[in-house]
Amino acid sequence: MRVADFSFDLPDELIARYPTAQRNASRLLTLSGENSELADKKFTDLFNLINPGDLMVFNNTRVIPARLFGQKSTGGKLEILVERMLDDKRILAHVRSSKSPKVDTLIDLDGGYQMKMLARHDALFELELQSDKTILEVLEDVGHMPLPPYIDRPDEDTDKERYQTVYNQTPGAVAAPTAGLHFDDAMLADLKAKGVNIAFVTLHVGAGTFQPVRVDNVLEHKMHSEWANVSQEVVDLIAQTKAAGNRVVAVGTTSVRSLESAARASGDSPLEAFSGDTDIFIYPGFQFKVVDAMVTNFHLPESTLIMLLSAFAGYEAVMKAYQHAITQKYRFFSYGDAMFVTKKAP
């Protein structure tokens, strides 16, 4: 397939630049993978679409304030976007500057901190903090929330709360697992009271999630790598859910990628726990082994995420659903509305 097959025209006014007043006040478009039927609903209607005994799997990564501003010793300004924390002092990062910093040069950050340029790894720079504090402490002190480029505004204080799920736990993401932004504590409590099981995986979403696909042929795309963890407890819950004839519902494409990465690593054996880097690329033709349904936001044209959704529910059904969403003026991308999608028949 061609990357251009996943293109669509989106009016600029449908890009959500701020979240709804309440987390669960967004709209929900349902898409049945079995028959391609669409239905316009409210996000709170999701409660009626999840059955007792179903297992909902959330990504509990915490978004770090990963954007830093500073200047080189020459006085030139630069912007750092953390891709990954290597340890308490070192990061891999994207650096935006008129000229790339050279090895061993020092970078002065806002707040009086300094970083040293250690090495370059293709498009990423390895930087070391010159401070008694940890990277995480410095980010919490002077870092900015890494809003996606299409939101096209400076981050605000409210983004520290709203560009973060209510169940976040493990710091490391530089982009939010956005399907989870719609859930508040009350809705999670209601789902549990209904008999829905809740589980958590971790995938630290990297800045690569915003990188465009730069090839014409889908098969030639090289996926960026991210760290994920699927515990034995989650594996056991999945086995129990499947054995009882119930569904595994992934909240967000990052949860999907975590679970299917574990399945890929397990090979032909029963599902096993997984912890490590994953570069899984899911596109039409992929055989899903774990996930039966998913909650997801509306994704960018020609992105790997709309390819994943097309693999899950069928290419034609997804493109038709997106045209419907545009016609009905759904809000798109990270702060936008959501979909509930069931897997297409084999």
UniProtKB/Swiss-Prot annotation:
Pathway: tRNA modification; tRNA-queuosine biosynthesis
Listed EC numbers: 2.4.99.17
Keywords per UniProt: Cytoplasm, Queuosine biosynthesis, S-adenosyl-L-methionine, Transferase
Record's GO cellular component terms: cytoplasm
InterPro entries in alphabetical order: QueA, QueA_dom1, QueA_dom2, QueA_sf
Pfam families: Queuosine_synth
GO function terms (MF aspect): S-adenosylmethionine:tRNA ribosyltransferase-isomerase activity
Catalytic reaction(s) noted: 7-aminomethyl-7-carbaguanosine(34) in tRNA + S-adenosyl-L-methionine = epoxyqueuosine(34) in tRNA + adenine + L-methionine + 2 H(+)
Localization per record: Cytoplasm
Gene Ontology process terms (BP): queuosine biosynthetic process; tRNA wobble guanine modification
Main location: cytoplasm
Known partners and oligomeric status: Monomer.
Family: Belongs to the QueA family.
Function: Transfers and isomerizes the ribose moiety from AdoMet to the 7-aminomethyl group of 7-deazaguanine (preQ1-tRNA) to give epoxyqueuosine (oQ-tRNA).
Name by which UniProt lists this protein: S-adenosylmethionine:tRNA ribosyltransferase-isomerase
